[in-house]
Amino acid sequence: MEHKKAALLDLTQYGLTGVTDVLRNPSYEQLFEEETRPDLEGYERGVMTELGSVAVDTGIFTGRSPKDKYIVKDDTTKDTLWWSDQGKNDNKAITPAVWDDLKSLVTTQLSGKRLFVIDGFCGANPDTRLNVRIITEVAWQAHFVKNMFIRPTEAELENFEPDFVVMNGAKVTNPNYEKHGLNSENFVAFNLTERVQIIGGTWYGGEMKKGMFAMMNYLLPLKGIASMHCSANVGEKGDVAVFFGLSGTGKTTLSTDPKRQLIGDDEHGWDDDGIFNFEGGCYAKTIRLSKEAEPDIYNAIRRDALLENVTVRSDSSIDFNDGSKTENTRVSYPIYHIDNIVKPVSKAGHAKKVIFLTADAFGVLPPVAKLTPEQTKYHFLSGFTAKLAGTERGITEPTPTFSAAFGAAFLTLHPTQYAEVLVKRMEAAGAEAYIVNTGWNGTGKRISIQDTRGIIDAILDGSIDQAKTKNIPVFNLEVPTSLPGVDASILDPRDTYTDPLQWDSKAEDLAQRFIKNFAQYTDNEEGKALVKAGPQL
């Protein structure tokens, strides 16, 4: 029944002609059969693993390709968008003419083919969600977006009209990129007037997920709704926490907590009703995953989950420790693969705790500090972490990075707009902010997940607010001297060095980087006033 109706779906309005068949919102069973067909070759082919989930290889792109991201500069966007020539971001402008050329490459590639169409929602709040239609010729890409977007009911599909269309032409590249003045033959491009995203040359699934996040980041703050690169969960008493952080800092791991219900692991909005998830699934890193350390995520890897770039041995077992292909090995799964989730809709009330996760490769920042409102704005705009190996193409060593709002790669408006909306929402809810370092200290080792979980527990149950504190110089951060279940010797990062002078010189180096980065926000009075909330030399 479903398939017969689907054949009638008219795709000519998107420039797609001669389409031989359309599989609209196929079942997981159908997708499994399609993506494991023995005649598939190359990156189209999925392989079965002993855990029951299919594994795929995304080729040379094992992460997003920020250098190949473009947005059409036209009357809609020219004055509102945060362009790459105005700040550190990936919003490179292209003309409508270049867009037309790129789009015709994709429509030519997808025309005359058998296509998968997935209709889904981005956003759990019906008032503000985007209806997204994804069109691809690759079965596992359809599986990926079925996992990651919110799955409509049969009734919701009846009258589904897309607000945004994503056409994934991963098999096609742009031979004229030099003439167009672009970075390479690959492209991920957006047109906010047409409300279309097109993809060429990269097979990485995350481009579709993060593409729609970037669009929500444009549309929601203009309505006064916070749009956030964060995970979120809720306790038994309805107490909501959000966890901001860049890739690899612990958003998914730390918000997946047996004692709390998961709202979502990566993208959320905050409106008058509270926190809501944008997504219908999770996209967890699997490098060095173990059943003991992360049972919820490990147990989510079963039939209907989709693994990316992991090493599958000849006996179908998975070597999660092998990062030879990439450190950015991942799994996508529908959110209900985690038992402990908010049901039936991934949303909850207002957040009381806002946690900024950072993975400090320098070994300077404390494992936890409570932030003042001014420090909250300062650290939100700074968005410091260390880029971890392989989450983007071309990065293999931990290197310091500053990413406004802990997600500059996905921001489409000026960072101060996100800071303003967030702080307004926090003040209205009486929320408090903390910075948590999940990175390294003077021992040269990463802070243990057990200690970090103990810190998070202390924040969530309020015991951190009763703890005695002391001040960490240079960064002027208040840190607890002891917390239940946490190794007290790590709470002051200076104590982890055999020679405390080492910390001093590293702290000075990192402070200078913070100051240099924050200079970009001092072009107005509010930005100038926030300098005092940052490190002082």
Curated annotation (Swiss-Prot):
Q: Which residues form the signal peptide?
A: none
Pathway assigned to this chain's UniProt record? Carbohydrate biosynthesis; gluconeogenesis
A GO CC annotation given for this chain: cytosol
Where found?
A: Cytoplasm
Tell me its EC number(s), please.
4.1.1.49
Please give the catalytic activity noted in the UniProt record: oxaloacetate + ATP = phosphoenolpyruvate + ADP + CO2
Binding annotation for ATP: 210, 229, 245-253, 294, 330, 446-447, 452
UniProt: substrate binding residues: 64, 204, 210, 330
Disulfide-bond pairs as recorded: none
Q: What class of enzyme is it?
A: lyase
Where, by residue number, does Mn(2+) bind? 210, 229, 266
UniProt GO molecular function: ATP binding; metal ion binding; phosphoenolpyruvate carboxykinase (ATP) activity
Highest taxon in the source lineage: Bacteria
Q: Which GO terms describe its biological process?
A: gluconeogenesis
| Cofactor or coenzyme needed | Mn(2+)
| Pfam families the UniProt entry points to | PEPCK_ATP
Q: Which InterPro entries did the record assign?
A: PEP_carboxykinase_ATP, PEP_carboxykinase_C, PEP_carboxykinase_N, PEPCK_ATP_CS
Q: How is the cofactor bound?
A: Binds 1 Mn(2+) ion per subunit.
Listed A to Z, the keywords are: ATP-binding, Cytoplasm, Decarboxylase, Gluconeogenesis, Lyase, Manganese, Metal-binding, Nucleotide-binding
Please state which protein family the record places this protein in: Belongs to the phosphoenolpyruvate carboxykinase (ATP) family.
Function of the molecule = Involved in the gluconeogenesis. Catalyzes the conversion of oxaloacetate (OAA) to phosphoenolpyruvate (PEP) through direct phosphoryl transfer between the nucleoside triphosphate and OAA.
Output the PANTHER family linked to this UniProt entry: PHOSPHOENOLPYRUVATE CARBOXYKINASE (ATP) (PTHR30031:SF0), PHOSPHOENOLPYRUVATE CARBOXYKINASE ATP (PTHR30031)
Quaternary structure, per UniProt, is:
Monomer.
Name used for this protein in its record = Phosphoenolpyruvate carboxykinase (ATP)
Please tell me the species this chain comes from: Aliivibrio fischeri (strain ATCC 700601 / ES114) (Vibrio fischeri)
